[in-house]
A protein has these predicted regions:
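Short, hydrophobic/glycine-enriched beta-strand segments
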Residues: 1-10, 155-157
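Short catalytic helix/loop segments, enriched in acidic residues and glycine
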Residues: 19-35
């Protein structure tokens, strides 16, 4: 399987609830997603529309990590700068003036992955992590035609600057129209969109989408793997040497890592374990993971095996619940 990650690039600054300010540093949804997969395999490429100053920021990182440039498309002038402000509960939002929001909304369109870019990488042995807003139903109708004709596997992470119930109708329409192979939301997004803080109710709503694999992220607590009418909660995973520094991008990295785990194993628990391990690497510094190597990959696979064995020992009923997935 060949893997791809599509989203945005940005230079980020974070302000935490205690007033600590860090940055600027390299970020972006597409790059974080790429990192979540690259932890596990070198067979992954970013699919990005980039700015003319992109290599001024990312050039050294790309060279040192031998990142495939084939699908980097020059599309606009200046890389986005994003200012994220976190609350104590982990919720964050980007802070802009009204004029900045208007300007960014116009320019942001240049960063989104295009249908022709997707068509170029689509195939039965290809998988795409895509960060894209729940907007533009025509895009999703055309995308489904490409996906169905090619056999491309898709993990859709809906993109939100601020999520609220106003997105519910179009989100549900896209879910019905496109029917992604895999998808993900975090707790804040799901709660805001569906108007409830009841986790059981949120899970029932998500299960009604009938997505084959859904990665429901619950922040520092961990994530649910929802598949085949079953649900498995996998706590967040600490990776030795990557103590918690900054959660920015962990949703992107973990969702993309979970996609890799699901497609490689067909096991929802292992997929969530691998996703959470990708997040565990991502949280260990400000910005994107600086360096990928064989030692990291060996550490990741060893950690996955260790955590998976422990989870099955702690949850003896899971072995039987997982049988339908492991027989495929």
């Amino acid at each position: 399987m060949k893997y791809y990650a599509a989203g945005q690039t940005s230079v980020d600054k974070t302000t935490f609830a205690d007033g600590q300010v860090n940055g600027p540093y390299l970020g972006g949804t597409g790059i974080y997603g790429y990192g979540g997969i690259r932890v596990w395999t070198e067979d992954v490429s970013p699919v990005l529309n980039v700015a003319s100053d992109f290599y001024d920021f990312y050039g050294t990182w790309i060279d040192e990590n031998r990142v495939d440039r084939t699908h980097l498309n020059l599309a606009y002038d200046k890389t986005f700068f994003v200012d994220m402000v976190y609350q104590e509960n982990g919720y964050y939002e980007s802070i802009y003036t009204i004029q900045e929001k208007i300007d960014n909304a116009f320019l942001y369109g240049y960063t989104n992955c295009r249908l022709e870019q997707i068509a170029r990488i689509a195939g039965p042995q290809a998988a795409l992590y895509l960060y894209y807003e729940p907007i533009n139903t025509v895009f999703w109708e055309k995308f489904r035609e490409i996906r169905d004709a090619s056999g491309l596997k898709v993990m859709w992470e809906p993109g939100f600057s601020v999520c609220d119930s106003g997105f519910r109708e179009i989100f549900l329409k896209i879910m019905e129209t496109f029917r992604p192979d895999m998808s993900t939301l975090n707790w804040f997004e799901a709660s805001a969109m569906f108007g409830t803080k009841d986790e059981e109710e949120l899970i029932r709503i998500i299960e009604s989408f009938q997505v084959p694999f859904f990665f429901f992220r619950c922040g520092k607590r961990g994530a649910y793997a929802l598949a085949g009418g079953k649900r498995f909660f996998v706590p967040s995973i600490d990776v030795e040497g990557y103590e918690t520094v900054d959660p920015t991008g962990c949703g992107n990295a973990s969702s993309a890592g979970a996609m890799y785990g699901w497609l490689e194993t067909g096991n929802p628990v292992m997929a969530a374990v691998m996703g959470n391990i990708s997040g565990g690497f991502n949280v260990g510094q400000f910005g994107i993971i600086p360096r990928f190597d064989e030692k990291m990959r060996q550490t990741a696979f060893a950690k996955a095996s260790q955590v998976y064995s422990r989870l099955l020992a702690e949850n003896p009923s899971w072995e039987k619940e997982l049988e339908p997935f492991l027989r495929k």
